[in-house]
């Protein structure tokens, strides 16, 4: 017996019998209990009506039938589309592999087509005839005529069917039952007919089962697997072991039939018995089959929900809507439910629970209700085949609980436990592995075991079974090998082993395109490779890959490269370019520089066929490939949003006014700081851009590749308002940072969102967004406000431009410059032409201001613009122009700031040959100053004779005329020894324009630009010294000026309306100018102003003495400046100007001469009124009366006046002799004190004069006010402080106090009286 | 003795991977990557009983040419060793010894105060020691 077994195995190893051609990968454990039916479409047509029929047929996968003894059976049907004939040969080994039924569906339009459909049906019957029980044909014919169709609707459907059958006839050799339907028929009865068909199959199966069960043990024949036939040739079949083998195999076959017939309990018992019998004789192959059968039967009872999985899977595959995330959720739910059921089953097995059976009964009752109608119909239809059943039997079926062993709610005792199933499968697989011909059976068993373990939520066992599949030695074709990998992939994905699934997906993909393959399927390879992305932490969105980078870069790079190869072989250039871009974007940091260069070159070559673009790529199967961008090619180091040029920068009109306020408080700064922080958080740009104006963003780029990188069509990426980007083309050198300016124009107003830039490099267009740039601290975007369009202007001037740059602030808004050279006092003008360059916007608002490096007041004198003339020209239409005239006057100080008193003090002592005017000045100064010195100086007493001789020298001729004649000749010697040379003065100024128009003006925006002015002031005329001398009449005085010509040319000087003088270059001359004296009204007004000022200053406790003098001095200065205008002209040129005397400083003595004297003189000599320049003659020894009348013309009383009369002789050589005691005698007092001279009061004094010697004498009559009584000042202050004083009294007191506080004043009778004494 | 030795971080990113045959490095990386599924599953099983958890995970899976063993530390760092299938003389005790030595080398390497956990192991000393361990002379 052992030798026989060895011989059998030896024959098996020979491999003479063909094995199953390929495994049935879709098979599951529960398919052991199904009746196998081939569902095939025949004919050329694949209309939608056939698809609907297919679905209706497939829906009938479960029926309930009553057997001959009245017990209900649960029958399942499995529909397949393809079934190799070789699988039928294994029907004895496992009966579920036997094809039992055949259903064909076809469509015909004519009799010939119908005959062809019948022929195809018959050929299929012949092919599977050895195992086929029953077959059906479903034919769809053409529709009836419209009239007949209407008639048919009224009639019964059966009649309609018959009519179609009457029209067409099947061939004579066609013996199957055919169902005819119209093309538009709803096929309402198709499902019931298929149910009848299934029932027919069941009854045939049942008869086979009963026949098998009735066989006697001693008469059974040996059942064989296809490859076992040769092994048993010549053996003694009657031996004990062979007899047991025959009985065991028959028992196993009967168990298979019982399982298919719905008798699970019987099947379990039979499997166990067969297992024991076959194991005793060492029949390993059939022992494995019994073990597999046990697992299948147990799975039927434990996991009936796996059938639902099958249904769900089919629907999912049909709809092609299944996705990995969606599949995972039901998976978890199903696993959880399975675990719960396993626990419940265990609990039920251990204890009988009364509640559990009720729940089961309820569930099964609902299931019975759902199929009750079908069962009823089936029963009615098959009445001829089964014993008669009554209606009460039908109602019993509806209410009956689970049949058989489950009536008590308990599982059979011999069922396998959940953990035992995997063990039994493992043992079965081990038994199968002993036979090479059973490799397909082994593979299918492993797959079934995997599916069971998936249901049991035991992934490690699944992994073990799947891994063992690879060890099975199968002579498979490449297509079958790929199919195996795909099935393994799917199962791995179900247990969540993404990496394993990806591994096998990659293997399947590589198998498709293996070397030596006759027809490489790159499409499948690509699809599988794409499906394996999840396992390697890849997805099609490059941004997700970058964010979730989790290592394994080498694998990712290799996978993407393989994908690129597949895409290229497919001929899909766009796809290859897209994936290569994806590779560079996601794996740039993980590649070496050499690899980076190689990939870049490859990308360049790929994109030469089809360019890459940043739009999603939709494949034919509906897959969407997201866009990939070369964000880091080139590498962006920095990106800065640039403000507009200064002269085009928008500013707020109102804000500017607010900013000009004089006070800035601290809280404003805090708010400003907070606002700044807030802006920083929002990535808000502080400045604004202007609609329709060119804007700029500066980008610093670096080329990380070792070769030149051309970048074309580089633009800004924006969001928000419409933005028109200008393309930029550049070539980046390797590893060198390059600055690029990207320009664009915002078309709308609002907020512009700058997100990055777009590039076109290496043949790929990329959107490089800031938020996707890693390793840099870029904000996600920049937000810029775009304000409405502002007009644009161009500015030109009539003066030449200058190349020098301005040192003033805000120099960046200067758009043009003008340079001008003027002599001090010269006038000129500049015409500024403003053109509105805007095409559509008028210039509606234009204001200007002038800034310079000199003081505001001086600036206003130098530059003048007529504002009204400008406003009259507004608005300026587009392309229009406006002219602005700026008048420029070279304002300067012509008066030398040297003190005149010191000048005269220095000049007077050594100058005895001066003119009479100079002499008068010396007399005035020395007369006042020499009063104290005369008393203490014996020098003057010794010089008395000289004065007398001097006075007699000038006794004849007009003194002023002589002086004027002498002056030009001695001008050079009279002036100061050295003149301070005046330097050139340089003035920088900016004429700033703020302009606006259109909507921007409404919004409160404007622009600002400036014209830079360079004004050079050359020195022209300078007054080095000045003095005030009394004139011939009392209403005038002489202003004596020393004028220097500081230019290099001859100057003609008009110092009065009628007088002219020429001054050579760098020369100076002395000029006397008669000027009217300042009127008393002005003096009164000045004093009134002084009083008002004093009232204010009382609160500040300031002294008023100096302020009054200052006021009066200013008054006289203004008086002189207003009346004296010195016009100068450079001889031979057109250059001319006016020299102003503004700023001239007058001393107190000068002020007394300038202002009109408050005293009015009336002097008579010998009863004759003395007139100016009258000849007065008297005789020696004769008494002459001298009468003097004083009148106070001022508004205030004069106090402490001293009237003095002195006679002296003037030698006209600078000497005056006052010691005339021996020549003149005065009877009566020559010094009279007047304590008080009220307003408009007159005083008269008369005395007699006797001359002892003949000669020429002069009389000096003067009135002096002395502030010697200063003790009254405190009382005056006290009086002023008294609150009880009335206003008028207070005013009067203040007048007095102010007068007392004044300095000493000397008023003289001008000119001095000249008396000629003659002999009788 | 070993084809490949890999150190995988807690986030399943490779910290160190070395092979004896450079031409097969990519293929071995694929195998190591696929083995992580089984490693994760075995780590998950031991969650319920931490006191009975063993660091050595045993044979993860085998192919025609390779056997892949796993080891996991208390800090969830995984060690993967790929051994030739034809080396039938290699016993399980020897594989355990390899992992024990590898664990010692790894702890020495991460004692470097300048090593940042989670980054690649670039220690030359560690690399040399692993090479010796791989060639069987350790």
Curated annotation (Swiss-Prot), chain A:
Comp. bias (Low complexity): 362-400
Keyword Nucleotide-binding tagged: no
Modified residues (Phosphothreonine): 329
Biased composition (Basic and acidic residues): 329-340
Annotated knockout phenotype: Failure of both actomyosin ring constriction and furrow ingression in male meiotic cells.
Main location: cytoplasm
Keyword Cytoplasm: yes
Job description of the protein: Cooperates with Rab11 and fwd/PI4K to mediate the flow of membrane through the Golgi, which is required to support cleavage furrow ingression, therefore promoting cytokinesis in male meiotic cells.
InterPro entries, per database record: TRAPP_II_complex_Trs120
Lineage, top ranks: Eukaryota, Metazoa, Ecdysozoa, Arthropoda, Hexapoda
Sequence segments annotated as region (Disordered): 313-411, 923-954
Family label: Belongs to the NIBP family.
UniProt-annotated location(s): Cytoplasm; Golgi apparatus
Ranges annotated as biased composition (Polar residues): 314-327, 345-361, 945-954
Subunit structure of this chain's protein: May be part of the multisubunit TRAPP (transport protein particle) complex.
Entry-linked Pfam families: TRAPPC9-Trs120 (PF08626)
Keywords tagged on the record: Cytoplasm, Golgi apparatus, Phosphoprotein
Gene from which this protein is expressed: brun
Disulfide bonds: none
Annotated GO CC locations: acroblast; cytoplasm; Golgi apparatus; trans-Golgi network; TRAPP complex; TRAPPII protein complex
Gene Ontology biological process terms from the UniProt entry: actomyosin contractile ring contraction; Golgi vesicle transport; intra-Golgi vesicle-mediated transport; male meiosis cytokinesis; meiosis I cytokinesis; meiosis II cytokinesis; meiotic spindle organization; spermatocyte division
Modified positions (Phosphoserine) in chain numbering: 317, 672
UniProt-recorded name of the protein: Protein brunelleschi
């Amino acid at each position: 017996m052992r030798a026989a077994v060895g011989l059998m195995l030896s024959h098996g190893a020979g491999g003479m019998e063909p094995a199953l051609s390929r495994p049935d990968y879709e098979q599951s454990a529960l398919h052991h209990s199904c009746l196998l039916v081939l569902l095939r479409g025949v004919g050329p047509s694949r209309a939608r009506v056939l698809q609907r029929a297919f679905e209706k047929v497939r829906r009938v996968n479960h029926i309930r039938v009553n057997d001959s003894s009245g017990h209900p059976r649960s029958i399942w049907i499995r529909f397949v589309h393809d079934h190799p004939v070789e699988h039928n040969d294994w029907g004895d080994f496992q009966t579920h592999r036997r094809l039992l039924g055949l259903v064909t569906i076809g469509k015909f339009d004519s009799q010939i087509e119908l005959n062809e459909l019948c022929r195809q049906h018959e050929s299929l019957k012949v092919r599977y005839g050895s195992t086929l029980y029953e077959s059906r044909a479903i034919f769809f014919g053409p529709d009836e005529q419209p009239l007949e169709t209407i008639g048919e609707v009224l009639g019964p459907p059966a009649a309609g069917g018959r009519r179609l059958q009457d029209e067409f006839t099947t061939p004579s050799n066609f013996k199957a039952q055919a169902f005819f339907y119209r093309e538009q028929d709803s096929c309402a009865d198709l499902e019931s007919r298929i149910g009848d068909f299934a029932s027919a199959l069941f009854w045939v199966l049942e008869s086979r089962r009963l026949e098998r069960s009735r066989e006697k043990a001693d008469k059974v024949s040996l059942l064989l697997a296809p490859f076992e036939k040769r092994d048993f040739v010549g053996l003694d079949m009657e031996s004990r072991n062979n007899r047991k083998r025959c009985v065991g195999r028959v028992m196993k076959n009967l168990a298979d039939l019982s399982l298919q017939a719905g008798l699970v309990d019987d099947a379990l018992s039979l499997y166990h018995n067969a297992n024991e019998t076959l194991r005793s004789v060492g029949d390993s192959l059939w022992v494995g089959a019994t073990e597999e059968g046990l697992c299948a039967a147990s799975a039927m009872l434990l996991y009936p929900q796996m059938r639902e999985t099958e249904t769900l899977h089919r629907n999912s595959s049909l709809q092609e809507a299944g996705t990995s995330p969606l599949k995972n959720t039901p998976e978890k739910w199903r696993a959880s439910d399975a675990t719960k059921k396993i626990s419940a089953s265990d609990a039920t097995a251990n204890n009988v629970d009364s509640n559990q059976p009720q729940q089961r009964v309820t569930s099964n009752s609902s299931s019975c209700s759902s199929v009750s109608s079908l069962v009823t119909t089936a029963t009615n239809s098959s009445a001829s085949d089964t014993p008669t059943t009554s209606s009460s039997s039908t109602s019993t079926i509806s209410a009956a609980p689970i049949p058989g062993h489950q009536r008590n709610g308990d599982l059979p005792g011999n069922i396998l436990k959940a953990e035992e199933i995997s063990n039994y499968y493992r043992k079965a697989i081990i038994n199968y592995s002993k036979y090479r011909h059973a490799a397909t059976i082994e593979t299918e068993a492993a797959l079934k075991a995997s599916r069971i373990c998936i249901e049991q939520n035991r992934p490690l066992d699944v992994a073990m079974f799947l891994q063992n599949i690879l060890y099975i030695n199968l002579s498979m074709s490449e297509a079958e090998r790929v199919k195996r990998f795909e099935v393994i992939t799917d199962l791995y994905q179900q247990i969540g082993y993404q990496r394993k699934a990806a591994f096998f997906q990659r293997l399947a993909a590589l198998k498709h395109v293996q070397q030596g393959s006759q027809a490489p399927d790159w499409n499948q390879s690509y699809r599988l490779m794409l499906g394996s992305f999840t396992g390697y932490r890849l997805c099609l969105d490059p941004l997700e890959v970058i964010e979730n980078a989790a290592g394994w870069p080498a694998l990712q790079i290799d996978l993407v490269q393989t994908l690129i190869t597949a895409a290229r072989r497919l001929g899909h250039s766009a796809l290859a370019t897209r994936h290569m871009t994806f590779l560079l974007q996601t794996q740039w940091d993980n590649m070496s520089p050499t690899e980076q260069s190689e990939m870049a070159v490859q990308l360049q070559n790929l994109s030469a066929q089809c360019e890459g673009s940043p739009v999603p790529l939709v494949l034919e199967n509906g897959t969407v490939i997201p866009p990939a961008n070369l964000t880091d090619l080139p590498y962006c180091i920095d990106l800065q949003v640039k403000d507009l040029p200064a002269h085009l920068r928008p500013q707020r009109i109102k804000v500017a006014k607010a900013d000009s306020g004089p006070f800035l408080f601290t809280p404003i700064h805090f708010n400003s700081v907070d606002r700044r922080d807030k802006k920083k958080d929002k990535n808000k740009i502080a400045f604004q851009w202007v609609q329709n104006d060119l804007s700029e963003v500066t980008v610093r780029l670096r080329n990380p590749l070792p070769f030149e990188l051309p970048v074309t069509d580089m633009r800004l990426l924006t969001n928000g308002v419409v933005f028109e980007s200008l393309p930029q083309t550049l070539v980046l050198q390797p590893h060198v940072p390059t600055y690029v300016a990207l320009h664009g124009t915002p078309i709308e107003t609002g907020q512009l969102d700058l997100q990055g830039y777009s590039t076109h490099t290496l043949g790929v267009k990329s959107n490089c967004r800031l938020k996707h740039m890693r390793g840099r601290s870029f904000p996600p975007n920049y937000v810029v406000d775009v304000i409405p369009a502002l007009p644009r202007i161009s500015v030109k001037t009539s003066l030449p431009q200058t190349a020098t740059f301005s040192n003033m602030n805000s120099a960046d808004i200067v758009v043009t410059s003008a340079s001008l050279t003027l002599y001090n006092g010269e006038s000129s003008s500049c015409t500024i032409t403003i053109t509105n360059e805007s095409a559509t916007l008028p210039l509606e608002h234009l204001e200007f201001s002038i800034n310079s490096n000199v003081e505001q007041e001086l600036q206003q004198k130098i530059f003048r613009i007529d504002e009204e003339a400008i406003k009259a020209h507004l608005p300026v239409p587009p392309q229009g122009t406006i002219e602005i005239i700026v008048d420029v006057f070279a304002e300067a100080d012509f008066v030398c700031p040297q003190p005149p008193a010191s000048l005269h003090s220095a000049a007077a002592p050594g100058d005895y040959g001066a003119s009479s005017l100079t002499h008068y000045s010396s007399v005035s100064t020395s007369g006042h100053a020499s009063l104290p010195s005369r008393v203490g100086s014996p020098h003057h007493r010794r010089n008395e004779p000289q004065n007398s001789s001097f006075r007699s020298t000038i006794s004849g001729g007009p003194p002023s005329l002589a002086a004027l004649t002498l002056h030009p000749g001695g001008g050079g010697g009279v002036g100061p020894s050295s003149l301070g040379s005046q330097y050139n003065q340089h003035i920088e100024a900016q004429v700033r324009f703020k302009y606006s128009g259109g909507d921007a003006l409404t919004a409160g925006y404007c622009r600002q630009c400036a014209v830079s002015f360079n004004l050079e002031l050359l020195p022209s005329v300078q007054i080095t010294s000045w003095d005030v001398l009394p004139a011939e009449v009392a209403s005038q005085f002489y202003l004596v000026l020393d004028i220097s010509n500081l230019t290099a040319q001859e100057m003609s000087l008009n110092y009065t309306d009628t007088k002219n003088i020429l001054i050579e270059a760098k020369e100076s001359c002395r000029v006397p100018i008669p000027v009217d004296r300042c009127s008393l009204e002005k003096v009164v007004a000045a004093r009134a102003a002084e009083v008002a000022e004093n009232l204010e200053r009382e609160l500040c406790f300031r002294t008023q003495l100096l302020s009054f003098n200052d006021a009066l001095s200013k008054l006289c200065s203004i008086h002189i400046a207003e009346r004296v205008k010195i016009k100068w002209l450079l001889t031979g040129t057109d250059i001319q100007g006016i020299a102003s005397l503004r700023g001239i400083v007058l001393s107190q003595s000068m002020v007394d001469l300038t202002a009109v004297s408050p005293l009015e003189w009336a002097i008579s000599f010998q009863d004759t009124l003395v007139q100016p320049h009258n000849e007065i003659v008297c005789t020696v020894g004769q008494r002459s009366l001298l009468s003097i009348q004083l009148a106070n013309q001022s508004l205030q009383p004069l106090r402490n006046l001293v009237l003095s009369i002195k006679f002296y002789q003037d030698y006209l050589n600078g000497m005056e002799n006052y010691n005339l005691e021996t020549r003149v005698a005065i009877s009566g007092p020559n010094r009279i004190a007047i304590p008080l001279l009220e307003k408009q009061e007159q005083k008269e004094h008369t005395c007699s004069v006797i001359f002892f010697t003949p000669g020429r004498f002069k009389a000096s009559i003067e009135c002096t006010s002395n502030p010697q009584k200063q003790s009254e000042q405190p009382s005056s202050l006290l009086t002023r402080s008294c609150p009880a004083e009335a206003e008028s009294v207070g005013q009067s007191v203040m007048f007095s106090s102010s007068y007392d506080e004044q300095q000493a004043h000397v008023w003289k009778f001008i000119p001095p009286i000249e008396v000629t004494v003659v002999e009788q | 003795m070993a084809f490949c030795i890999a150190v995988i971080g807690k986030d399943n990113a490779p910290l160190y991977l070395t092979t004896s045959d450079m031409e097969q490095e990519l293929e071995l990386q694929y195998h190591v990557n696929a083995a992580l599924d089984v490693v994760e599953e075995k780590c998950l099983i031991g969650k319920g009983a931490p006191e009975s958890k063993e660091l050595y995970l045993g044979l993860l899976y085998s192919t025609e040419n390779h056997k892949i063993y796993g080891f996991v530390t208390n800090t969830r760092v995984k060690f993967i060793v790929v051994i030739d299938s034809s080396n039938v003389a290699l016993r399980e005790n020897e594989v355990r010894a390899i992992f024990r030595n590898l664990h010692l080398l790894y702890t020495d390497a991460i004692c470097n105060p300048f090593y940042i956990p989670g980054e690649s192991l670039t220690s030359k000393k560690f690399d040399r020691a692993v090479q010796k361990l791989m060639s069987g002379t350790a």
